[in-house]
Amino acid sequence: MLYHLLYPLHEQFSVLYIFRYITFRAIYATITALMIAFILGPWLIDKLSRLQIGQSIRKDGPQSHFKKEGTPTMGGTLILLAIVLPTLLWTDLTNVYVWVTLLVTVGFGAVGFVDDYRKVKLRNSAGLSARQKMLWLMLIAGTAGVMLYSYPPFQTTLAFPFFKGLRPELGLFYIPFAVLVIVGASNAVNLTDGLDGLAIGPTIIASGTYLLFAYLAGNARLAEYLQISSVQGAGELAVLCGAMVGAGLGFLWFNTYPAQVFMGDVGSLSLGGALGTIAVITKQEIVLVIVGGIFVVEALSVIVQVSSFKLLGKRIFRMAPIHHHFELKGWAEPKIIVRFWIISIILALVALSTLKLR
């Protein structure tokens, strides 16, 4: 919005030429998101407490979690506001990729909102059935996939890190692949959201990493130099990623141990969906496995646990997702969180190294 209002005036006021630069707008989208979270956070937490929108705790979970019963949830609403508003303020709103990402982010957030609301209303931790949730997520992601496939400049090739010459053309099959990436990322972040600050930390790190990927993909000269896919218009997603970083930092202020508020599914599903969509658009889908390695391990731990129990009648972990396994081993919650953050930073650095290792 500000881009469209102020940049056209740059001939009369040369200082406004700065709105042309994605880096400037990404920085201020980050700051704007952070300020929105700081300002609205206390009000929202108080409102959620008054409405008794509290978290229900699994009865079979770690006993240390029982004290968290009733902590305000659905704090992801704050994250959504802090992402969407700065994005509308600072991005070029004629950019298709921005709207596709917002569609997934808000759409997944709406599914999460309904899920959280049902949990609170029914006073249990079940919410929407797995089938209902998956159906809606796949429908939204599928819509995004069709929109991208139908957009002529978008490429349906798949890029692999470390192998510059390996770029298979998926054609129409890119749509189900995009759905897999977007829905998979969303559910992986959702599974990670089990400890105070555990999910939002790696999300901030991943968002910052994809801010750089988006900027590079949108710059044809830099993309050619680094031998990565050039995606005209993808640079605007750097501004959206900046908003995600700011929103994440602002939310972490209230979500750090001991948490004053939980993001709920409205936050985790929308953040994961946004990351998956940005990975698809920037042609860094495979790299998401590295950047979001914490999310991948959390999701795999659940798959392994369920498969092992069904096939062998035994559980590999004391409890899944894997962060609960470490809790039951006696690790303090803050120790698990910070160590997972450290691993996430290392993985982000490895992912960034793929820009040169080709």
Swiss-Prot record:
Pfam families, per the entry: Glycos_transf_4, MraY_sig1
GO terms for biological process?
A: cell division; cell wall organization; peptidoglycan biosynthetic process; regulation of cell shape
Predominant location = membrane
Recorded metabolic or biological pathway in which this protein acts: Cell wall biogenesis; peptidoglycan biosynthesis
Enzyme kind, highest EC tier: transferase
Q: How does it sit in the membrane?
A: Multi-pass membrane protein
User: In its keyword annotation, does this UniProt entry include Membrane?
Assistant: yes
* Cofactor(s) essential for the protein: Mg(2+)
Q: Which UniProt keywords apply?
A: Cell cycle, Cell division, Cell inner membrane, Cell membrane, Cell shape, Cell wall biogenesis/degradation, Magnesium, Membrane, Metal-binding, Peptidoglycan synthesis, Transferase, Transmembrane, Transmembrane helix
> What reaction does this enzyme carry out catalytically?
UDP-N-acetyl-alpha-D-muramoyl-L-alanyl-gamma-D-glutamyl-meso-2,6-diaminopimeloyl-D-alanyl-D-alanine + di-trans,octa-cis-undecaprenyl phosphate = di-trans,octa-cis-undecaprenyl diphospho-N-acetyl-alpha-D-muramoyl-L-alanyl-D-glutamyl-meso-2,6-diaminopimeloyl-D-alanyl-D-alanine + UMP
Can you tell me which family this protein belongs to? Belongs to the glycosyltransferase 4 family. MraY subfamily.
For this protein, the record's NCBIfam families field holds: mraY
Q: Which PANTHER family match?
A: PHOSPHO-N-ACETYLMURAMOYL-PENTAPEPTIDE-TRANSFERASE (PTHR22926), PHOSPHO-N-ACETYLMURAMOYL-PENTAPEPTIDE-TRANSFERASE HOMOLOG (PTHR22926:SF5)
Protein's recorded name: Phospho-N-acetylmuramoyl-pentapeptide-transferase
Q: Which organism is it from?
A: Syntrophotalea carbinolica (strain DSM 2380 / NBRC 103641 / GraBd1) (Pelobacter carbinolicus)
| Taxonomic path | Bacteria, Pseudomonadati, Thermodesulfobacteriota, Desulfuromonadia, Desulfuromonadales
